[in-house]
From Swiss-Prot:
Pfam families: EIF_2_alpha, S1. InterPro entries: NA-bd_OB-fold, S1_domain, S1_IF2_alpha, TIF2_asu_arc, TIF2_asu_C, TIF2_asu_middle_sf, TIF_2_asu. Belongs to the eIF-2-alpha family. Residues 12-83 form the S1 motif domain. The gene is eif2a. eIF-2 functions in the early steps of protein synthesis by forming a ternary complex with GTP and initiator tRNA. This is Translation initiation factor 2 subunit alpha. Keywords: Initiation factor, Protein biosynthesis, RNA-binding. One of its GO terms (molecular function) is translation initiation factor activity. Heterotrimer composed of an alpha, a beta and a gamma chain. It comes from Thermococcus onnurineus (strain NA1).
Amino acid sequence: MPRKAKEYPEEGEFVIATVKSIHPYGAFLKLDEYPGKEGFMHISEVASTWVKNIRDYVKEGQKVVAKVIRVDPNKGHIDLSLKRVNQQQRKAKLQEYKRAQKAENLLKMAAEKLGKDFEMAWQEVWVPLEEEYGEVYAAFEDAAQNGIEVLKGIIPEEWLEPLNEIVQNYVEVPTVTIDAEFEITVPKPNGIEIIKEALIRARDRVNEDKDIEVKFTYQGAPRYRIDITAPDYYKAEEVLEDIAEEILRVIKQAGGEATLLRKEKRIKKIKRRGA
């Protein structure tokens, strides 16, 4: 079970908790990511409406996403709230927890390759990566996308090779895809050939970058759709701007007209090879 590197959660943090015991005035919950730590949820923090019976809302053994509203490390007190967690925050926390579970499983694989137990892996890899990136899976994504060298100086050298093999095969790197349409007309007998040449030149101009993928689709005269996949939205926008400039330049020189029509961005994930 993934655990945090720090000893106590911070106020305002969302945590995964398991209901341990229920009382008329509230409930005690075990903090799954903080071994040995418990929090208390007063009945007034269970729901935004009046709660007559707390058992109508929580049950022993139930896992919930709770918000930390007070922390007193000196007394060991942690106060939690259920009513202050909205659906979007709950979804985001559960996603974060799933990513931590994936990271833990991958780190166990690397530890096995080195013949080390997970406690050693946690101390040498998990803690420094969480401190540097905020979450370990984000570090693995960075390594999968930009090379294991990004982790040099953060974790011991002996971990780099086994981790590199694992993240390149099992880590999904988020990418952004944006799409748009061009309206292009060239009033000449060879207008179609001129348009094709402009699109090919614009595509080949950026496709040398392995992290960028550009695809054109004919939508019916005079429209041509473009899909650009890149590591992030800003890079995709930069590529679209470069391509648009090239297309507009070539078409204008040929005596034609070209207009860029924008659409919405889409986000997807690409599995690394061998996944």
